[in-house]
Amino acid sequence: MDAVTVNNFFLIGAVLVGMSILVSSLSSRLGIPILVIFLAVGMIAGNDGVGGIVFDNYPVAYLVGNLALAVILLDGGLRTRVSSFRVALWPALSLATLGVLVTTGLTGIAAAWLFDLHWMEGLLIGAIVGSTDAAAVFSLLGGKGLNERVTATLEIESGSNDPMAVFLTVTLIEMLASGQTGLSWGFVLHLVQQFGLGALLGLGGGWLLLQLINRMHLAGGLYPLLVISGGLLVFALANAVGGSGILAIYLCGLLLGNRPIRSRHGILHMLDGMAWLAQIGMFLVLGLLVTPHDLWPIALPALALALWMILVARPLSVLIGLIPFRAFHDREKAFIAWVGLRGAVPIILAVFPLMAGLPNAQLFFNVAFFIVLVSLLVQGTSLPWAARLLRVVVPPDPAPISRAGLEIHPTSEWELFVYHLNKEKWCIGAALRELKMPGGTRIAALFRGTELLHPSGSTILEADDILCVIGHEHDLPALGKLFSQAPDRGLGARFFGDFVLEGDAQLSAVASLYGLKLDGIDGEQALGRFIAHEIGGEAVIGDQVEWNGLTWTVAALEGNRIRKVGVKFPEGRPGPGLFL
């Protein structure tokens, strides 16, 4: 490779990445998932597009795809709160194993019939497209304001279902290549090995990396690089010993993100940029890899297969996978079924048969690419609409306009929160001494216009003041009520109900106040405890229960305890207008 070729490579790469970033603004305007934009740029630059770039190097595409997935999952793990596991771990694992098996089987049967293939080849197509994609899920769910149970289930599922899909794909390829026509029980041991070694190396490697980071004194910019290199080492080691590298690097990030770690905010900021670059690079390469005119001959059967998977296979797999978990409302199950997003993973898995030289390998790749395109366009585009229709959106916690870490000590986790005081907030016109600040927080600075003030207890707050507060992440809910204006998501003021009651209120007192019948229910228990029992599992904000003709909504939590409950009356039925 001479200097001119290298320079042309840099030129083309920079132009494609720059174009992807610039046209990404069309995503919000057109309501199209941003991943489709990146994919489209690659296709336009490819063999059939205006760019005319011929790219058919499948090993390079496999390398780029795996590297990008590793970075995206590391970033996703760092941002996942381990508290979400209390409501979603077992449901997500059920979907990641049993759900993938059901989806693979149903999709495989349809694929074999639609494309006139052997049943094992049909199952291979089902396995290739059987898992949801972490890159697509993390990208499209971010900032949508979904309730915790739905978000956590989808994110944990997407981060943990790839081992099953990879295992099924590799096993079926080996069987087809060797001429086997039946399944053996040895695949169960292989599956346990994938999950077990992936989890062990992910958590073990994450712990070792955490100890190393907190004991090393490095330049600030080196900590993110150490996290990335350590995560990739865990990913590669897990793959090398027969475990799931994808699961390992996700769990490595999860452990790092939920423990005190040096330079946390520097790591998160850099990983955010790296994850975006990984998504752009991965979907550009996959867009270049496909030849659009090869998709037209299979368009009708591939579209039928995609719709079968979206409308039949995925809903049935979710319905079966969530049978043991009664805390899930039918609305939540329907939304989880709809958001079975396919992305880069199926396309990368579709490269496996090509590298193995299987007959019909190009057909498998084209079908997988078509299904991913339909999934992103249909499911990804309709995601906000489906969330509102199925009422899985909850009012977001008010947040500061910006926040920055204060690297005092790895275990202190102090942060600086910046608030813009909206004119509608009650604190406008109040003196600072009148504010009920959370314990352990301090006002560090007050800006009025471009002027830095020296605040005292008698300083009066005015509209459009900028307030800087030092505190911890757990102080955000209380600070938000004082200073923030929650973003408008089209949710009415009555989302939680006509009145909000304390979760500690005695149930008999609530029943007496609203004229409700207990019908043998223990009236001595707290309202919050009763609602939790009716939900049937770990509660999340936004959970609803119908009781005595009224709608009871979980409005606030304190740990696992329901702290506040909203009550909503049917239209035309007045309430007593009291708070307990």
From Swiss-Prot:
Could you list the residue ranges that cross the membrane? 3-23, 34-54, 58-78, 95-115, 122-142, 163-183, 185-205, 218-238, 241-261, 270-290, 303-323, 335-355, 363-383
Q: Which organism is it from?
A: Pseudomonas aeruginosa (strain UCBPP-PA14)
Which protein are we looking at? K(+)/H(+) antiporter NhaP2
Principal location? membrane
What is the purpose of this protein? K(+)/H(+) antiporter that extrudes potassium in exchange for external protons and maintains the internal concentration of potassium under toxic levels.
**Keywords assigned by UniProt, alphabetized:** Antiport, Cell inner membrane, Cell membrane, Ion transport, Membrane, Potassium, Potassium transport, Transmembrane, Transmembrane helix, Transport
| Membership in a protein family | Belongs to the monovalent cation:proton antiporter 1 (CPA1) transporter (TC 2.A.36) family. NhaP2 subfamily.
- Pfam family name, one: Na_H_Exchanger
The UniProt entry lists membrane topology as: Multi-pass membrane protein
- Where is it localised? Cell inner membrane
Q: Looking at the keywords, is Lipoprotein present? A: no
Question: In Gene Ontology terms, what is one molecular function of this protein?
Answer: flavin adenine dinucleotide binding
Q: Name one GO biological process term.
A: cell volume homeostasis
